[in-house]
Regions:
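Extended beta-strand/beta-hairpin segments
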Residues: 1-43, 54-137
Length: 137
């Protein structure tokens, strides 16, 4: 079972602590004294799929030198302002990176392993995935 504890600090500023003891400060977007809760969801999705894709590429002997994921989301205008669409863009830099290995790693992450992105997808959020490979000599 996963657990989390949220503690109020001041105004709308809170600190969340994971069951593993890691903390993050959150706040409303208006106050901007911490990460917003909806931003946390995007960070979670980006982090989840990043860990998967990097692990899969390493297992397939891809020489990754740098890796970045950029996540953008569109939300509904009216409350509860849920995500309508989330776009995840992977940027992989390395030596002789295989297009097919990258595509397979992203597919495995987004369809089998990354519970965060699969949860959003199953809840009705439209998920889009793109990537670019920068091969360095």
């Amino acid at each position: 079972m996963m657990t989390a504890k949220i503690k109020w600090l001041e105004s709308q500023k809170i600190v969340g602590e994971s069951g593993t003891g890691h903390s993050v400060v959150m706040d409303s977007i208006d106050s901007n004294k911490g990460v917003g809760p909806m931003e946390m969801i995007l960070l979670g999705v980006g982090g989840c799929t990043s860990i998967d894709v990097l692990s899969i590429l390493k297992k397939s002997k891809q020489d990754v030198i740098d890796f970045e994921v950029r996540v953008k989301a569109e939300r509904e205008e009216e409350h509860p302002r849920v995500f309508q669409e989330v776009n995840i863009h992977y940027i992989i830099k390395g030596r002789k990176i295989s297009e097919s290995h990258v595509e397979r790693a992203i597919e495995l992450s987004t369809e089998k392993y990354c519970g965060a992105s699969i949860t959003l997808s199953r809840s009705g959020t439209k998920m889009k995935y793109t990537h670019e490979i920068v091969n360095i000599e």
